[in-house]
A protein has these predicted regions:
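N-terminal anchoring/stem segment of glycosyltransferases
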Residues: 1-69, 255, 259-261
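Short His-Asn-centered micro-motif
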Residues: 8-12, 38-42, 75, 97-100, ...
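Short, solvent-exposed loop/turn segments at secondary-structure junctions
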Residues: 12-14, 43-45, 68, 102-104, ...
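A short, glycine-/small-residue-rich helix N-cap motif at loop->alpha-helix starts
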Residues: 16, 69-80
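GT-A fold catalytic core of metal-dependent nucleotide-sugar glycosyltransferases
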Residues: 77-125
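Conserved catalytic core of nucleotide-sugar-dependent glycosyltransferases
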Residues: 105-179
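Catalytic core and acceptor-binding pocket of nucleotide-sugar-dependent glycosyltransferases
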Residues: 145-260
Length: 262
C-alpha cells in the first residue's frame, strides 16, 4: 500500500486557511509525487491565489446546499474528507485524510511502514489512543472503495451523508461528530484493519512545540500538530521541518503489523 492522495479541508477561517500552503508543501516532502486535494466548505468561493500554490492539485468546492444551512461549515469540512475520499479517486489510488494544521514529519511512518500492507486493507495510523474515546480523523488510509464499504457510503448523496452524521452528534455544536460516526461504522464493519500501536507516548510534536533535539534528528517524531495561528509560530515550525531527516529510519522501529477486526 502506498498513499497517492491526501485530503485536507477548510472553511473560510484564516486561522486554518493560512496553513494550506506550508502543509501542502510538507506533504510533498514526505511523500514525493503525492496529490493533494483541498475541500473548500463554505458559502463563499475560495481565494483565487490558491490556484498558484505549488503542489496543490485540486481545490474541490463542496457546495453547501440549502438542506445543510443549519450545520456549521466547520463541521461540514470535517466530514467532507471522509465522503470525498470515497468519491474522488483514480484507479489504484490510496487516500489519507488529515487536518490542515497537521504537518507530517516521517517518511518511515507515512510511506515505509505501509509497504508491507496489502492495498485492499483499511488502515488507520493513529487509532490506538484509548483515552481519546474515539478513533481520530487523522489518519484514515484506504482506497475509495474501502472508504465507501467501511464507512457505509455506498449509497446516498453528500447531503444525505452529512445529515446522517449531524443527526448522530453527541455535542450540541456537532464537534467530533465525524470521528464518532466513523468510529461506530468501523466497529460495525467486519473488514480487516491495519492499526499499528504508537511506538511510545512521545512520538509526535504537539501544540506546545516541545521536542527533543536528538529524537528529531533520529526521525522519531511522525507529525507536528501545529499551534494556531500559523503566522505567529511560522519561524519555529519551519525550523523543526528543516531539521527533520530525509530517509533516516528511526532507531525505535515499529511494532509487529497489527491486523485486526474491530
Amino acid at each position: 500500500m502506498r498513499i497517492t492522495q491526501v485530503f485536507l479541508s477548510v472553511n473560510d477561517n484564516s486561522v486554518y486557511t493560512e496553513f494550506v500552503e506550508p502543509v501542502v508543501a510538507q506533504w510533498h516532502r514526505v511523500i514525493p509525487g503525492v496529490r493533494v486535494t483541498l475541500l473548500w466548505c463554505d458559502h463563499r468561493l475560495p481565494p483565487h491565489s490558491w490556484e498558484s500554490i505549488p503542489g496543490l492539485d485540486d481545490v474541490h468546492v463542496v457546495v453547501n446546499v440549502p438542506d445543510l444551512v443549519n450545520i456549521p461549515t466547520a463541521i461540514t469540512a470535517l466530514w467532507a474528507r471522509y465522503f470525498f475520499a470515497s468519491l474522488i479517486s483514480a484507479p489504484g489510488d490510496v487516500s489519507i485524510i488529515s487536518d490542515v494544521d497537521m504537518f507530517p514529519l516521517s517518511r518511515d511512518y507515512f510511506v515505509h511502514q505501509l509497504e508491507a500492507v496489502p492495498s485492499d486493507t483499511y488502515a488507520h495510523l493513529h487509532a490506538n489512543v484509548p483515552a481519546y474515546g474515539r478513533i481520530p480523523s487523522c489518519y484514515h488510509v484506504a482506497s475509495a472503495a474501502n472508504f465507501r464499504a467501511v464507512l457505509g457510503l455506498e449509497k446516498g448523496s453528500w447531503t444525505e451523508s452529512m445529515l446522517k452524521v449531524w443527526a448522530s452528534r453527541k455535542h450540541a455544536d456537532g464537534w467530533f461528530c465525524d470521528e464518532d460516526f466513523a468510529t461506530c461504522q468501523m466497529q460495525a464493519s467486519r473488514h480487516t484493519f491495519y492499526m499499528p500501536s504508537r511506538r511510545h507516548q512521545f512520538d509526535r510534536i504537539d501544540r506546545d512545540l516541545y521536542y527533543d533535539v536528538e529524537m528529531l534528528s533520529l526521525g522519531a517524531y511522525y507529525d507536528l500538530h501545529a499551534p494556531r495561528p500559523y503566522h505567529e509560530h511560522a519561524a519555529k515550525i519551519q525550523s523543526i521541518l528543516q531539521a527533520v531527516p530525509g530517509e533516516t529510519r528511526p532507531a525505535l522501529g515499529h511494532d509487529i503489523l497489527a491486523y485486526r477486526v474491530l
